[in-house]
Amino acid sequence: ITQIEIDKSIVCFVAISDTQEIAGKVSFKLREGNIVRYQDAFVNENHRKKGIYKMLFDARQMYVDVNYPNHKIEAYCRDTTLEMFKKNGFEVKRNLYLVEK
């Protein structure tokens, strides 16, 4: 897992496969009011079901715990990742809806 600081407010964690392709990524954004917003999680289809998302999630969480211990963490997640968040102490605050036109 490689950590990349995009700018002063976005940090991305990238998993690189043995063949040097991007296997997955997660990131977070620093927001006003001491808020860390988790965003942009993705694991390449060829690398799913191998524990990569958990490794990325854990790397990001450890980084935030060490560097931003007094920040509130927010995240929007899908049904497929909700249990991972709950296992890590997150609570569902509200349901959101995806709409498009």
Predicted regions and their residues:
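Conserved acetyl-CoA-binding loop-helix of GNAT-fold acetyltransferases
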Residues: 49-62
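Residue-level recognition of the GNAT/N-acetyltransferase active site
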Residues: 44, 78
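Conserved catalytic-core motifs of GNAT/GCN5-like acyltransferases
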Residues: 74-76, 91-101
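Conserved active-site tyrosine of GNAT-family acetyltransferases
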Residues: 85-86, 90
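A structural microfeature
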Residues: 23-24, 94
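Conserved GNAT acetyl-CoA-binding A-motif
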Residues: 64-77
